[in-house]
Amino acid sequence: MTVGRTWAVVLTGLHGDLIEVEADLSSQTPAFVIIGLADKAIGEAHQRVHNACANSELPLPRRKLTVNLSPASLPKQGSALDVAIAIAALATEHALDRDSLAQTAHIGELGLDGRLRPVPGVLPAVAAAARMGIRKAVVPFANREEAALVEGVEVL
């Protein structure tokens, strides 16, 4: 599989929008490109994701990796998409369960060592994901109790 997909959530105030995170591998010169109206923090995600994956012994492929954050017209900000970007990127070459990824929102910042760091706004993010049919959420441990307040979502 060369295209990996999963879900994330971006917040505007307390309003959350579901974002499809797609990663595609191509045989071009190695690069890591993020597209889809991302701010500087998301633009820097490629370095956090690359180092976190390498330091977790899950190195990313040495090919061109393009990550699309859709809908492209919606502004995206902050580091809470790091985990979703990493999962979509890893799904391009690793056998991750597509059905599970299609039902899961990944929310959190990655440390360079691979740790998940807490992010603000997990409660409204998970609530927005639940309203849009998402039934599982991967969040940093420090945000777990907050995320668990949303009924109908399994917090991992």
Question: For each predicted feature, which ranges?
Answer:
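Peripheral, non-AAA+ core regions of ATP-driven protein-machinery
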Residues: M1-L156
